[in-house]
């Protein structure tokens, strides 16, 4: 009996350790209907942005949303609209951490926002090329740039494929892919 209790306690400890490790992981799998993309995020460089992203992921927020904006030779953007181009309700905006030294180079992951530098919520984009004009160059709102918080480590071919999709205007939004790119899920690995 005592050995069984020890075995149960050991298994419980291992399960809790594995769950804790998964929560600390900085690697995520973005499953789409067009293929999978694996990303790595950088909490030491963009702690608030990564915490924000992890919160949305843990709540299943991105499941069923789409990459709603695709601009060839620029970027692909998702994380805010469903298949019917209805915007999903988000949490409050976060502070822009674009001064972290990370650059908007090809296959980096950055926060999308409005003209207000501190308006990013759930939407993100993947740079298809080096987009230096999106980098932080100063503290004024016209120079603050877009916060990079991760990069694609697998599935660059999928990113490139999505980046070449034909687009149209739908519900007042331009650059919407004609072929839907659905985020089935984003899972922490």
What would you call each of these model-derived segments?
Residues 1-9:
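Bacterial N-terminal signal peptides that target proteins for export
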Residues 7, 20-189:
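Cyclophilin-like peptidyl-prolyl cis-trans isomerases
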Residues 8-17:
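Bacterial N-terminal signal peptides
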